Amino acid sequence: MFRHGATDWARQGRHTGRTDRPLLPEGEAEARALAPLLAAIPFGAVLTSPLQRARRTCELAGFGAVAQPCSDLMEWDYGRWEGITTAEIRRTIPGWTVWSHGCPDGEDKAMVEQRCSAVIERALALAAASPEPGPARLALFGHGHLLRSLAGTWLGLGAGGGALLVLGTGGIGVLGYEREQRVLLRWNGWPAPAATMEGRPEPASGSPLPGQ
C-alpha cells in the first residue's frame, strides 16, 4: 500500500477527503522515489483511488498505464470537517478524533470499514486470479486515513485500528500473511531495497509526517 505524496493541505494538517488537491513538487518527488523500488516487483494488479493526488502518485511510480480505479480507496468523507484542522475542530468538540467521533455529514469508522472490506475482497479475488507464480502481489495507492483503516480491517481490528498506525506521505505499508495469520510485514517505510518489501530483513521504520 502506498500513500500519495505531499499536498498543501496535508502539510497544513487540513482534513483532505474528497477535495481534489494536486501534489506539491515535493509530493511528486516522493512519488518518483517509489519507481525504482517498485520496478523490480511483479504486481499482479494495481488499484488506485481516482482522486488526483493518489492517481498522480501511481503514475509517477510507474503504473499509470495499468492501474485500475477503485472508488473504495478514496479518502474518508470528512463532511463538515473537510479542509478543517483537528485543532480547529477541538475548539468545539474537545478530544475529537476521526476514529472516535466520525464526521458530521460525512463518514464514520463503521462506514469506512465497509469500504475497506470491499477493497480486501476485491484484492483477494485479484490475487487468486493472478497468473504470477508464487504469492500474488497487489499494489494499492490511496490516502492516509483510508489506508490506516484498511490495515486495521485486515488485522481484524476494524477500521478503528487505524488509530494505532501512522502513515506519512509517500509512505509504504505491506500487508500479508505469516502462515495463515494476517499480519503487517512492513509499515510507514520509505523507498528502500526491494527485499524489504517482503518484510525482511528488518521491520518498518520512519518518523510520521504531518498532515491528514
At which residue positions do the language-model features occur?
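Acidic, low-complexity terminal tails and accessory targeting/binding regions
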Residues: 70, 76-87, 129-136, 152-212
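Short, hydrophobic/glycine-enriched beta-strand segments
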Residues: 1-4, 140
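Loop-to-helix element that buttresses phosphate recognition and phosphoryl-transfer chemistry
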Residues: 3-57, 104-117
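Active-site metal-binding loops of divalent metal-dependent hydrolases
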Residues: 5, 144, 190
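GST superfamily/GST-like fold recognition
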Residues: 144-148, 178
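Short glycine/proline- and acidic residue-enriched helix-loop micro-motifs
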Residues: 91-114, 202
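Phosphate-coordination/substrate-recognition cap region in phosphate-metabolizing enzymes
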Residues: 32-97
